[in-house]
Amino acid sequence: MAHLIVTLLLLSVLTLATLDFTGAQAGVCYGRQGNGLPSPADVVSLCNRNNIRRMRIYDPDQPTLEALRGSNIELMLGVPNPDLENVAASQANADTWVQNNVRNYGNVKFRYIAVGNEVSPLNENSKYVPVLLNAMRNIQTAISGAGLGNQIKVSTAIETGLTTDTSPPSNGRFKDDVRQFIEPIINFLVTNRAPLLVNLYPYFAIANNADIKLEYALFTSSEVVVNDNGRGYRNLFDAILDATYSALEKASGSSLEIVVSESGWPSAGAGQLTSIDNARTYNNNLISHVKGGSPKRPSGPIETYVFALFDEDQKDPEIEKHFGLFSANMQPKYQISFN
């Protein structure tokens, strides 16, 4: 009996260690809107060589899903915005989508289904607002019907522009004109114990506000910049994240976790802010920082996906072409470590 107890304790310790290790891993966003990009099989090899254990893709690209078979890379799979109307229209359509893109790939480690990206009443994706929640519900029903409800969580990725009054972070709330949109989504996530996916970019905050110090955005400030009722903020990433947590709390979403589904820094495209040095500093500090928590949620880690794996020269505007960590020849644009 004593031997059995010792064995069980060792297994428990190993399991906890494994969970902590995987939880601390930053992933990458793998977009394909670029010329001359490597094959999906080569991309998977690149990720393995660089200790990248999580990936976000924005659509169910079959060659990519094939390349991920047996790879041990955990996947966030997107339902693209143009597909939302179809999967929202009927349960049968959603069942077919899940069968074709999830169930047919039983040896791919699906972690999340991101139903829609940056759908909002306030941007160019507003036409998808009426169908988003029903699309999420239908995909959830299909995932649950496949017996995968505990393994794969269904959510959607929002932009931080849905929040306001974000300084200090404890004042953060959702804008009045998005509450009717976001609150039913929050209720859905609470019911299904799924995280909210948030695309979080200190770069765009500082690009639109000259009063923000660069050190605060790059995680290099040596002192507290914002003091919020005893919580000290040395970086903008934590401030934006915790403002979003405050907004969730005010919308009956205090039980939710946030997964940062995109964050990155461009290396060119818009003047002095967009330099190789700034991109290297931000992304390396981001990967290190998210192994811990934020002032509001200090236990951490903060599951985060770095945008993006490659430059994508088919995207617009110009700034969107330059977020890549690697060049098309799979050489790092600058020194980057996921260890």
UniProtKB/Swiss-Prot annotation:
The N-terminus is blocked. Induction: Accumulates following infection. GO terms for molecular function: glucan endo-1,3-beta-D-glucosidase activity. GO terms for biological process: carbohydrate metabolic process; defense response. Its EC number is 3.2.1.39. Keywords: Apoplast, Glycosidase, Hydrolase, Plant defense, Pyrrolidone carboxylic acid, Secreted, Signal. It holds the Pfam family Glyco_hydro_17. The active site is at residues 118, 262. It is found in: Secreted, Extracellular space, Apoplast. Implicated in the defense of plants against pathogens. Belongs to the glycosyl hydrolase 17 family. This is Glucan endo-1,3-beta-glucosidase, acidic isoform PR-Q'. It comes from Nicotiana tabacum.
